[in-house]
From Swiss-Prot:
Record Gene3D superfamilies: 1.20.1280.50
Name this protein carries in UniProt: Putative F-box/kelch-repeat protein At1g62270
SUPFAM superfamilies on file: F-box domain
Positions of the F-box domain: 6-51
Pfam families recorded: F-box, FBA_1
Highest taxon listed in the record's lineage: Eukaryota
Organism name: Arabidopsis thaliana
First and last residues of every Kelch repeat: 110-158, 160-211, 349-383
SMART domains on file: FBOX
Presence of the UniProt keyword 4Fe-4S in the record: no
Length: 383
């Protein structure tokens, strides 16, 4: 790897220096902070960090939330099609110290990723965390957490910098929609919302270009009271989005397949910060489909088109994934990597599934409750 030296840049115009540094990966710039005060000041500038996030080559790492801890993962699939076994390993814990907890250990129950920032729900509240720079912002909430509370991290898209915000709502018949602005360090109530949709309790949201997306269902208000118990789990019908610039829920996004049963498995993921991806498995046939949106270049996405990425019949393996499954798409190797909880297993399990009925099962570590694997992009974003 080429080493950057401050002396090499001393004769260059400052604008050119900024442009060069804006194209260097975040993890490399992190090591340069102590070499030059002027560079360190630049790396803390919001306008530069936005330019860097837009221009720099993205590094895609894999993290996993397990046992209330965020850990790094090593995932090497390069020799997959040359009959070389993949390498999968859970590495060390990422250090996140809770100043409000006597044990100092932070117990993280949920994670939401956006632009290199992690919004973590903990036992004592919320924290926005940049693992690359080790910055944290601990956020007070007015009332104790409700297990139905949903939080999302996103940003208003402005020319000079990103205005990061947290959206909170409680998925009830009606709720107060709340916004926390990172810049002002304050909460505000947007108003009471009576939605015509519901988001399943175990549905994990994802961020794409500053907006948040969830799998959602129609409100079944026509269901008779005596039928409610049978229809406790509604059929997932569409995606719902939240636009952090307009601070409104967006239009529904149609799914590329038809759910016939509430037991069908659906999960949502993001592919290389460019597209959304859907995991679908039919409960009856066990056939699995992976769909991806076509490239999204605009912040406001009122319509999306979908293309199939992978279709596999898992009936031979007799395996049914649950809705808590998390997955990553590897476009180069034409496979997906899934992490699922096995009721009768003593370990967390990773599955690699690909074309020509490629199927590989890897036990990684001792079993945890609903492990969640996700892609992480290091950034210099300031909080």
């Amino acid at each position: 790897m080429t080493t950057l030296k401050t002396s090499s840049f001393s004769s260059l115009p400052w604008d050119l220096v900024e442009d060069i540094l804006a194209r260097v990966p975040a993890t490399s710039l992190k090591r340069l902070r102590s070499t030059c005060k002027q560079w360190n000041f630049l790396f803390n500038d919001q306008i530069f960090t936005k330019m860097h996030f837009d221009k720099a080559e993205k590094q895609f790492l894999v993290l996993i939330l397990r046992l209330y801890t965020v850990c790094s993962m090593s995932l090497d699939l390069r020799g997959l099609h040359d009959n070389i076994d993949p390498s999968i390993e859970v590495k060390g814990e990422l250090s996140l110290i809770d100043p409000h907890c006597s044990s100092r250990k932070t117990f993280v129950s949920k994670v939401f990723h956006c632009n290199g920032l992690l919004l973590c729900t903990t036992m004592t509240g919320l924290v926005v965390w940049n693992p690359c720079t080790d910055q944290t912002r601990w956020i007070k909430t007015e009332v104790p957490h409700n297990r139905n509370d949903k939080y999302a991290l996103g940003y208003g898209n402005y020319k000079s910098c990103y205005n990061y915000k947290i959206m909170k709502f409680l998925d009830l018949e009606s709720f107060d929609l709340e916004i926390y602005e990172v810049n002002s360090n304050s909460w505000r109530v947007l108003g009471t919302v009576t939605p015509d949709f519901t988001i399943p309790l175990d549905a994990e949201g994802v961020s794409l270009r500053g907006n948040s997306y969830w799998i959602a269902s129609h409100k079944r208000e026509e269901i008779e009271e005596e039928e409610e118990e049978e229809n406790e789990y509604f059929i997932n019908d569409f995606l719902i989005s939240f636009d952090f610039t307009t601070e409104r829920f967006g239009p529904r996004v149609s799914l590329p397949f038809k759910c016939e049963s509430s037991w069908d498995t659906i999960s949502l993921s993001c592919v290389r910060e460019e597209r959304l991806s859907l995991f679908f498995q039919d409960d009856g046939t066990l056939k699995m489909e992976i769909w991806m949106t076509n490239n999204i270049t605009e912040t406001k996405t009122t319509t999306m088109s979908w293309s199939p990425f992978l279709k596999i019949d898992l009936y031979t393996y007799g395996h049914r994934f649950g809705n808590e499954v998390s997955f990553l798409v590897d476009e180069e190797n034409k496979v997906i990597v899934c992490c699922d909880e096995e009721e009768d297993d003593i370990n967390d399990t990773v599955y690699i599934i690909g074309e020509n009925e490629y199927w590989r099962k890897e036990d990684i570590v001792q079993r945890s409750y609903r492990p969640r694997m996700f892609s992480y992009v290091p950034s210099l974003v300031q909080i």
